[in-house]
Design a protein with these regions (language model features):
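Generic hydrophobic alpha-helical scaffold/packing signal
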Residues: 24, 59, 69-76, 93, ...
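Catalytic nucleophile loop
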Residues: 50-52, 73-97, 106, 181
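Amide-donor transfer/coupling interface in amidating biosynthetic enzymes
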Residues: 1-9, 14, 113-189
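Short coil/turn connectors at secondary-structure junctions
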Residues: 4-5, 44-45, 78-79, 102-104, ...
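N-terminal beta1-alpha1 cap of cysteine-dependent amidohydrolase-like domains
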Residues: 1-70, 74, 97, 113-121, ...
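Hydrophobic alpha-helical segments and helix-packing faces
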Residues: 65-68, 82-85, 102
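Acidic, Ser/Thr-rich peripheral helices and adjacent loops at domain boundaries
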Residues: 103-111, 116
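General beta-strand structural signal in soluble alpha/beta enzymes
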Residues: 31-33, 84-85, 178
Length: 189
């Protein structure tokens, strides 16, 4: 039997704070790190989990920790598995644009995010989707938007009434990402 690897989870008080205890418990061995201040160790990591939060409120701290952003990009480029939800997905993008400027992020995903006031649009509600024949549920809550092209979704996402919504869940390299916060981690990671 193969060695069980640990899950590395980004967590702090605001920029990566949308975590469900049931999700954390489902991982087995976990290690937490703060992308604003820590340098993560990827030794024996089987999955990097970047949950949601408000990275757009802490951009200067995230940009200042360049070694963390580079380590995450290197991990992704070397085939490391990543699951990123909302703020975590934003952190993996090329940049986040605000009214104060453009801030480089990890550069793993080939997209940029706008958090500009002029681009604000509330996306809110319960979501459900199918991945590899299994239904997953979650919620969506954000004001930010993709700049330019939106990723092509690998499955249709629905609201609580069963109506299709435009929120993509997508893959890039070994990354599974979406604005949707899922209540359980997909088996297909």
């Amino acid at each position: 039997m193969g060695e069980v690897k640990r899950t590395l989870i980004a967590r702090n008080s605001e920029s990566f704070s949308f975590l469900y205890q049931e999700v954390i418990d489902s991982f087995g061995e976990v290690t937490f790190f703060d992308p604003e201040t820590d340098f993560p160790s990827f030794d024996d990591v089987g999955l990097l989990y970047l949950p949601g939060g408000y990275p757009e409120k802490h951009l200067e701290a995230l940009v200042a920790n360049e070694s963390c952003r580079k380590a995450i990009k290197d991990y992704a480029e070397q085939g490391g598995r990543i699951f990123a939800e909302c703020g975590g997905m934003m952190y993996l993008c090329q940049s986040i644009k605000t009214d104060d400027g453009e801030y480089p992020m990890c550069g793993v995903l080939p997209y940029s995010i706008s958090a500009r006031k002029a681009d604000r649009k509330l996306s809110l509600g319960y979501r459900r989707l199918m991945l590899d024949g299994k239904e997953y549920r979650g919620h969506e809550f954000h004001y930010t938007q993709f700049v330019g092209d939106t990723p092509k979704s690998i499955t249709q996402v629905y609201n609580a009434k069963g109506e299709p919504v435009a929120t993509p869940i997508f893959r890039h390299m070994n990354v599974l990402a979406s604005y949707t916060h899922l209540y359980q981690i997909p088996d297909c990671l």
